[in-house]
Amino acid sequence: MALIWAIVPIVNGITFTKVPIATLIEEGETGMTIRELCRNKTFWILMLMMLCAGASEQGVSQWASTFAEQGLGVTKTIGDLAGPMAFAILMGSSRAFYGKFGDRMDLDKFMIGSSILCIISYLCISLAPSAFVSLIGCSICGFSVGIMWPGSFSKASMALRRGGTSLFALLALAGDVGCSGGPTLVGFVSGIL
């Protein structure tokens, strides 16, 4: 059975070799160097946005199964499925919603609204007297953080048109640092309290 499933990534790998990859900058232009990026204030704001996007996304998704177990009174196996699944479904819904209606919406307003919703969901998670209500907060947080990562990339491509591959690699790095640092910070703070 494992050999049959191994065929899928092999076929995908072969298929991917035939996919044309568009360049990020026009022919004849040069992309921004890392030094130029580091001197740009907008770049640092985008890096902070990505750091926070990763931290807020993973900080909650790591705890969603615990809230599902306690809030619904289910086994660890069911909690591990229900909590992260609710988070992921709403996160995907947010991205699908913006993908469908994004041409009619202002990205800045959508991201600001999502940030406010994220703060509300964090307050709900941390201050609610019931684990079930905290689980609902986790799910809502999934919806609120859904646009943060792709929205930050979209803003970066609009703000730094010559950013090139270096820009997106560094933004992804900031997001990954947030993804590892967010749950660590949540665990540290919850351990103190």
Stretches found by the model and what they are:
Residues K109-C124:
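Structural signature of the two symmetry-related core transmembrane helices
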Residues R161-I192:
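A late C-terminal transmembrane helix in Major Facilitator Superfamily
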Residues A68-E69, F101-G102, S157, L185-L193:
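Interfacial helix-cap and linker-helix signal at transmembrane-aqueous boundaries
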Residues N40-M85, I89-S93:
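Extracytoplasmic gate region of multi-pass secondary transporters
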Residues G146-L160:
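Intracellular juxtamembrane helix-capping segments at the cytosolic ends
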Residues S121, F132-I140:
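Paired small-residue
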Residues I21-L46:
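Juxtamembrane intracellular "pre-TM" segments in multi-pass secondary transporters
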Residues M1, W5-E26:
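C-terminal membrane-cytosol helix-exit motif in multi-pass small-molecule transporters
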